[in-house]
């Protein structure tokens, strides 16, 4: 009897500690790309990663986009029992619920609507038609059900039961058709997204809607810039302020123009209002060289402050305070790194792209990580590195105080990666990948020629890596196992599995056999 009680207690403890969800792009509303609940994969066993399964989906790529990072919920009550579900979104207005244990499809949903009159120019990678925003999954309701929120290519927001794919509430308009929205963020029942590149003639702005509002009033703030194209949309701080990079453009605050910077907007009195902003002091030069700010920040607690890190194609990382992003003149960061890469000021194949990552280790050290594309800057020499970096890498920095000021201290730089993408940290391991994408947009003999068919043909394949989070040492490489590249996607990590999707609409699940 005593042994039985012990077994029951152990089982109960396991059921309480097992779950590690990934309900939104970037892991959480702060976009930290940190998985705090991973227990299965460790520094010691990650070298044994294998492809547990891969599934070819019927999603049709549009321009260079295909599948987005899957969302993972570990306990979903379905008609076939409790399932761990990977919710995969595809550019062609598709949602797929996949049984994580088997790699089999549980349900699929396709959003049907009349073809919009306006769309981007065919062949233009900047403006694909269809669903461009990673969905978001809300917390369980009183009955334990989970709703997911997805923004279709016609600009309508769908509320769907994760267990069966059925619509839960009437859909409503939350944007314009083919507006190129970015990853949805859910904070206190308010959904945020951003739009960019003026696709199909649509505005570039932050969008918000309160799901509790019976009228579903759509609130926006427009910085009048080239586009808010941070990979994971907006990051939301503890005050509910949504922070998003504004892309290329001018800075003229007297006329409410906030290009080449980072803005923070918050819902107040039924409106989305600008609360603060940061603009680099060299924004004019950044605009001239198309080295815009386009990196979703990662927000974190540090001592008694709430800070954030972001970056730009110039290849610098900026450390900012959410309470005063750029000081009194909005142009003074807490800290700005020297150039990590991009000595040649290349607008297309170098610099920091996408989003950041941050975590705190068991000793209380706060880390900030950034990916970059291209060759490392010759003057940047971190204390630990792993050979020449010609195509991209991940850099880890420690957030430290020095003489009363906060700074970013380089700790390590990873091995060379073919266009390094935003990393994920879980249980002392950094998961990163080179996307294998051909990012070239301009040529000496023909000038600007940014066409999807050219870039797709010249792309190779992605490679997944696992690194020691404290040293950057390579622990695992997928080598040639992944057979296609991906564009503007990302990683998800939960419950001993690492997920990556590719342009050919294949979702890969890596893990340890038997777990």
Which stretches of residues belong to each language-model region?
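Bacterial N-terminal signal peptides
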Residues: 7-15
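Extracytoplasmic/lumenal domain signature
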Residues: 39-64, 77-82, 93-129, 137-180, ...
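Bacterial N-terminal signal peptides that target proteins for export
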Residues: 1-6
């Amino acid at each position: 009897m005593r042994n039985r009680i012990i077994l029951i207690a152990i089982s109960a403890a396991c059921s309480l500690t097992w779950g590690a969800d990934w309900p939104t792009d970037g892991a959480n509303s702060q976009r930290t790309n940190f998985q705090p609940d991973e227990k299965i994969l460790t520094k010691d066993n990650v070298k044994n990663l294998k492809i547990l399964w891969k599934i070819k989906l019927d999603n049709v790529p549009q321009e260079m986009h295909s599948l987005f990072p899957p969302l993972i919920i570990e306990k979903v009550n379905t008609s076939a029992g409790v399932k761990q579900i990977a919710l995969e979104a595809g550019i062609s207005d598709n949602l797929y619920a996949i049984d994580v244990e088997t790699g089999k499809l549980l349900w699929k949903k396709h959003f049907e609507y009349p073809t919009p009159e306006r769309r981007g120019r065919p062949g233009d990678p900047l403006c694909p038609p269809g669903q461009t925003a990673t969905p978001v999954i809300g917390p369980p309701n009183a009955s334990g059900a989970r709703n997911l929120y997805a923004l279709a290519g016609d600009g309508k927001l769908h509320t769907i039961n994760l267990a069966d794919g059925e619509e839960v509430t009437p859909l409503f308009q939350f944007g314009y058709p083919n507006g190129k929205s970015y990853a949805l963020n859910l904070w206190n029942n308010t959904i945020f997204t951003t739009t960019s590149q003026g696709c199909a003639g649509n505005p570039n702005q932050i969008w918000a809607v309160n799901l509790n509002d019976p009228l579903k009033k759509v609130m926006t703030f427009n910085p009048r810039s080239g586009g808010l194209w941070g990979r994971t949309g907006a990051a939301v701080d503890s005050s509910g302020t949504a922070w998003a990079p504004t892309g290329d453009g001018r800075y003229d605050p007297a006329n409410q123009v906030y290009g080449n910077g980072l803005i923070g907007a918050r819902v107040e009195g039924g409106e989305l209002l600008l609360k603060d902003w940061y603009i680099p002091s060299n924004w004019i030069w950044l605009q001239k060289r198309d080295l815009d700010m386009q990196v979703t920040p990662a927000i974190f607690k540090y001592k008694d402050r709430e800070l954030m890190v972001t970056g730009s194609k110039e290849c610098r990382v900026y450390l900012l305070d959410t309470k005063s992003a750029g000081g009194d003149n909005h142009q003074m960061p807490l800290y700005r790194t020297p150039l990590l890469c991009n000595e040649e000021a290349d607008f297309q194949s170098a610099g920091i792209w996408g989003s950041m990552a941050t975590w705190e280790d068991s000793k209380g050290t706060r880390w900030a990580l950034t990916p970059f594309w291209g060759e490392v800057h010759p003057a940047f020499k971190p204390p630990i590195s792993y050979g020449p970096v010609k195509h991209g890498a991940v850099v880890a920095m420690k957030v430290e105080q020095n003489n009363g000021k906060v700074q970013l201290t380089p700790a390590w730089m990873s091995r060379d990666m073919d266009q390094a993408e935003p990393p994920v940290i879980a249980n002392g391991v950094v998961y990163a990948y080179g996307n294998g994408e051909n990012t070239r947009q301009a040529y000496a003999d023909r000038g600007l020629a940014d066409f999807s068919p050219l870039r797709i043909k010249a792309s190779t394949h992605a490679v997944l890596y696992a690194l020691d989070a404290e040293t950057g040492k390579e622990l695992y490489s997928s080598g040639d196992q992944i057979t296609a590249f991906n564009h503007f996607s990302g990683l998800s990590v939960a419950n001993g599995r690492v997920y990556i999707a590719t342009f050919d609409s294949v979702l890969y699940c890596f893990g340890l056999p038997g777990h």
